[in-house]
């Protein structure tokens, strides 16, 4: 994983802040970029539905008598 850029401090020059902003943008893009090929959409949909079901509170789940 890429390293998070270090904040240059409140007394940094505008150039340092601009460089930090650019590095931070690159870092966030690396972490949040979509990863294709791991699962197809149907599997992802099944995964979302099953995790929603698993996360439902027990009170809402049907109880066997």
From Swiss-Prot:
Q: Which GO terms describe its molecular function?
A: neuropeptide hormone activity; neuropeptide Y receptor binding
PROSITE patterns from the UniProt entry:
PANCREATIC_HORMONE_1 (PS00265), PANCREATIC_HORMONE_2 (PS50276)
Swiss-Prot/TrEMBL keywords: Amidation, Hormone, Secreted
For this record, the Gene Ontology CC terms, alphabetical, are: extracellular space
Domain of life of the source: Eukaryota
State the compartments where it is located.
Answer: Secreted
Q: Which GO terms describe its biological process?
A: feeding behavior; neuropeptide signaling pathway
Modification type Tyrosine amide: residues:
36
- In this entry the propeptide is located at 59-65
Q: What induces it?
A: Induced in hypoglycemia, and, in vitro, by carbocal, in fetal pancreatic cells.
UniProt cross-references to InterPro entries, sorted A to Z: Pancreatic_hormone-like (IPR001955), Pancreatic_hormone-like_CS (IPR020392)
Q: Which family does it belong to?
A: Belongs to the NPY family.
Q: What else is known?
A: May be used as a marker of the viability of xenotransplanted fetal panreatic tissue in the immediate post-transplant period.
Protein name per its UniProtKB record: Pancreatic polypeptide prohormone
Q: What species was this sequence derived from?
A: Sus scrofa
């Amino acid at each position: 994983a890429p390293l998070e850029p270090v904040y240059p401090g409140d007394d940094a020059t505008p150039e340092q802040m601009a460089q930090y902003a650019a590095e931070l943008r690159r870092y966030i893009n690396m972490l949040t970029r979509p990863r294709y090929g791991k699962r197809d959409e149907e599997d992802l949909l099944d995964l979302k539905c099953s995790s929603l079901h698993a996360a439902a509170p027990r009170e809402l789940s049907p109880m066997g008598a």
